[in-house]
Amino acid sequence: MMPSCLSILFRALRIEWRETKRTLFPPTPIETGLFLFFFLLYGCIGYRMLFHTELIDVPNGGAGSYLGYDNLFHLHTRGGAFDISHPFFGIFHLLKTLLTILLTTLFKEKTSGIICLTLMNLLITGGLVLIYRYLKQIVRISSRRALLLTGFTGCFFTTVVLSFTTESYPFSFFLLVFSLLMLSREYMLTGYIKGRTILFLSFLCGGITITNAAKPAMALFLNKTPFWHKIRTGVKIMLPFVICVAVIMGFYTLKAKPVSYTHLTLPTSDLV
């Protein structure tokens, strides 16, 4: 029973990976130019923020005005922490730590910050390219209008700030736009959205921010099936995700050690 289930799972993952590549590649010359423009623009801003301010890489590990705890946690932690709001985000910390170890010899200063900001830049820039592709392939407007709308989105204050914000939001930005494009392409080509596709996207989006797991599942209501069939399919899709999160949370709970808070006690002089 178990081998057959694993075989079905791996086959589904192969199919979804193939569809993922079809959704992301190949880029057109306009998309390549759009990517390079925003990547370089955001890169210059991120470089300035990292090396000429103390907003991102706060000295002495003190909480700064720029997102305080959240930014410091995602920039400096070596992984191993579990947050129920971001159940699979520890994978990012693990990969970031490995890259930091590998690249420390090349970048003597602020290695972790460079890696994090480069990844955030790639996610936001990639999300903008997918917005352009959605406007062209799904909405089917002219290239000029698609570029205008994409450029307008790329200049939003929120988008610019996310390009140098080491947080879960850039991941969600990219994955939600990617999910919209992938689901729209499937519905446009077949007139039906498979539960397998929604399960795949729910794991991706929900793994970064747990509430995002339900967003791809909303596409079930586009299928021309009875209402209760949609509800049953939605439950079947959400159940594996919930079980997986519960197992991971249980693992971290059992592994966790009691934390001593004595080191948080401030000297009397600091309270005056």
Put a short name on every predicted segment.
Residues 193-224, 240-241:
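Membrane-interface alpha helices of multi-pass inner-membrane proteins
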Residues 131-155:
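Transmembrane-helix signature of polytopic, membrane-embedded enzymes
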Residues 1-46:
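Start-transfer (signal-anchor) and selected internal transmembrane alpha helices
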